[in-house]
Amino acid sequence: MFEATTILGYKGEYNGKKCAIIGGDGQVTFGNCVLKNNATKIRTLYNGEILSGFAGSTADAFSLFDMFERILEGRKGDLVRSVLEFSKEWRKDKYLRKLEAMMIVLNTEHIYILSGTGDVVEPEDGTIAAIGSGGNYALSAARALHNYASLPPREIVEHSLAIAGELCIYTNTNIKILEL
């Protein structure tokens, strides 16, 4: 189920201004068949202050989005507290523990991966996170471009997802991007 997409999140600073960017490809795969090539797997939450994206089962991901959005509203947009509460709820609920989806959530201050087991992972570098079947390709490309090229963050995300789309059969180059 996790072989259906690539999502890449980037949090950083450019020209003295903090930024957060998330991008994803548009491919939806069922077995060895591409069902759709222009799906949207990223969205804004909490009045456009939080970016999010998912990989995995679409129905499961929407359940997680709804739950996370409710918690985020209750915590008045506090991403750190919302992520921790979300993880606690996820682990307590037997139904949620069986969901086959992962999420990236970020703003200009924080970036997290929410795993299918309810784990919360903050990326080692605190800047770049990737999930999905092409996630490792996108992550590698993004780290290289971040460290060795002088590109704007949006271009880093675009180029990294394009590279993943060239290498991963479950990822395409129909890229959508959101930014704060």
Swiss-Prot record:
Database matches in Gene3D superfamilies:
Glutamine Phosphoribosylpyrophosphate, subunit 1, domain 1
Where the protein is mainly located, per its record? cytoplasm
| Subunit (UniProt) | A double ring-shaped homohexamer of HslV is capped on each side by a ring-shaped HslU homohexamer. The assembly of the HslU/HslV complex is dependent on binding of ATP.
Recorded family membership? Belongs to the peptidase T1B family. HslV subfamily.
Q: What is this protein called?
A: ATP-dependent protease subunit HslV
Q: One Pfam family this chain carries?
A: Proteasome
Q: Which domain of life is it from?
A: Bacteria
Q: What does this protein do?
A: Protease subunit of a proteasome-like degradation complex believed to be a general protein degrading machinery.
Any one cellular-component term (Gene Ontology): proteasome core complex
InterPro entries per the record?
ATP-dep_Prtase_HsIV_su, Ntn_hydrolases_N, Proteasome_sua/b, Proteasome_suB-type
Subcellular locations according to the entry: Cytoplasm
Q: Which organism is it from?
A: Helicobacter hepaticus (strain ATCC 51449 / 3B1)
Q: How is its activity regulated?
A: Allosterically activated by HslU binding.
Q: What is its EC number?
A: 3.4.25.2
An example molecular function term from Gene Ontology annotations: metal ion binding
For this chain's UniProt record, which GO biological process terms are given?
proteolysis involved in protein catabolic process
List the keywords (alphabetical). Allosteric enzyme, Cytoplasm, Hydrolase, Metal-binding, Protease, Sodium, Threonine protease
Q: Catalytic positions?
A: T5
Reaction equations catalysed: ATP-dependent cleavage of peptide bonds with broad specificity
Residues that bind Na(+): G165, C168, T171
Q: PANTHER family from the entry? A: ATP-DEPENDENT PROTEASE SUBUNIT HSLV (PTHR32194:SF0), METALLOPROTEASE TLDD (PTHR32194)
